Amino acid sequence: MSYPEKFEGIAIQSHEDWKNPKKTKYDPKPFYDHDIDIKIEACGVCGSDIHCAAGHWGNMKMPLVVGHEIVGKVVKLGPKSNSGLKVGQRVGVGAQVFSCLECDRCKNDNEPYCTKFVTTYSQPYEDGYVSQGGYANYVRVHEHFVVPIPENIPSHLAAPLLCGGLTVYSPLVRNGCGPGKKVGIVGLGGIGSMGTLISKAMGAETYVISRSSRKREDAMKMGADHYIATLEEGDWGEKYFDTFDLIVVCASSLTDIDFNIMPKAMKVGGRIVSISIPEQHEMLSLKPYGLKAVSISYSALGSIKELNQLLKLVSEKDIKIWVETLPVGEAGVHEAFERMEKGDVRYRFTLVGYDKEFSD
């Protein structure tokens, strides 16, 4: 099929006016031998999109098309493609579009930790091109970072899995989440909601840990076994002493999380893993020697192997994540940003209606 030489997206024009993006045409990256072009039909709205758009993580080159939970169909394969994907196949792209694929990290399914990592938008490739994301009609990426979407997962539900879902699945699977384990999910936002559903599907006894009881009913509907409202339970670490094998911190900010209370609730050898990337000014404060055989670490995204595992799990277990859809476009992106900033979403947004917004 034919498609335009320039791509078109809903682009952030400045950090100061980040909630009011404009439809913008731009040059795609050069097409290399192992690249794939994808015509986009849905894209999730991730908290990272807001952090980048608003400048929370520093100044970005503008204009910038964000969005890294992309679902669409293959329209072009590079001449040396060996991915097994076909033109017309429905596929997904998450928050990473390049790594060296040659270092020990890449060869051991740790692509997100490669020193040549390129994120789906806002980061320059080695040739200087700054990556552009999925609030657009097309995206061009290396084939390694393109995955097939199982037929029984609708596009609007598949999209949030590609970053948010993977980001919480990776620390769960790497740290033994499963039958006989007690797992805590801190923060019932978009990622925490998926973490709750995924942890239960993996067979763990699952606790949702939040500041108040406001989301208790939703947590129970998602299958949580227990709910802890930390501001209402005092020293909850003492109350739940020696309970958790694993806690995954999904909260967008670390400011209100007391890492000196949480270790009390951990079993010996327990692990606390944060997937949050807070604003630049935030710092983690710990009392010396307070961990007592408990480890605290950070997890970034997840591997392509893990993404395929996650999609298989969601397909086989028929997991239905909680998603609202909005039409892609200047107004739709504005609404998504406004509502996400206010916390007015249950629990992820997916942009749809790409065929109506973009015409080749």
UniProtKB/Swiss-Prot annotation:
Its main location: cytoplasm. It comes from the Eukaryota. It catalyses: a primary alcohol + NADP(+) = an aldehyde + NADPH + H(+); (E)-cinnamyl alcohol + NADP(+) = (E)-cinnamaldehyde + NADPH + H(+); hexan-1-ol + NADP(+) = hexanal + NADPH + H(+); 3-methylbutanol + NADP(+) = 3-methylbutanal + NADPH + H(+). GO terms for molecular function: 3-methylbutanal reductase (NADPH) activity; alcohol dehydrogenase (NADP+) activity; cinnamyl-alcohol dehydrogenase activity; hydroxymethylfurfural reductase (NADH) activity; hydroxymethylfurfural reductase (NADPH) activity; zinc ion binding. It is found in: Cytoplasm; Nucleus. GO terms for cellular component: cytoplasm; nucleus. The keyword Flavoprotein does not apply. Binds 2 Zn(2+) ions per subunit. Keywords: Cytoplasm, Metal-binding, NADP, Nucleus, Oxidoreductase, Phosphoprotein, Zinc. GO terms for biological process: alcohol metabolic process; aldehyde metabolic process; furaldehyde metabolic process. Its cofactor is Zn(2+). The keyword Phosphoprotein applies. NADP(+) binds at residues 47, 51, 188, 190-191, 210-211, 215, 250, 252, 255-256, 275, 277, 298-299, 301, 348. Zn(2+) 1 binds at residues 46, 68, 163. The modification Phosphoserine is found at residues 131, 359. Its EC number is 1.1.1.2, 1.6.-.-. Optimum pH is 7 for the reduction reaction and 10 for the oxidation reaction. Zn(2+) 2 binds at residues 100, 103, 106, 114. Homodimer. NADP-dependent, medium-chain alcohol dehydrogenase with a broad substrate specificity. Aldehydes exhibited 50-12000 times higher catalytic efficiency than the corresponding alcohols, therefore the major function of the enzyme is as an aldehyde reductase. The enzyme is active towards aromatic and aliphatic (linear and branched-chain) aldehydes. The enzyme is very active towards aromatic aldehydes, such as cinnamaldehyde, benzaldehyde and substituted benzaldehydes, such as veratraldehyde and panisaldehyde. PANTHER family: ALDEHYDE REDUCTASE. Belongs to the zinc-containing alcohol dehydrogenase family. Present with 21700 molecules/cell in log phase SD medium. This is NADP-dependent alcohol dehydrogenase 6. It comes from Saccharomyces cerevisiae (strain ATCC 204508 / S288c). The lineage of its organism: Eukaryota, Fungi, Dikarya, Ascomycota, Saccharomycotina. The gene is ADH6.
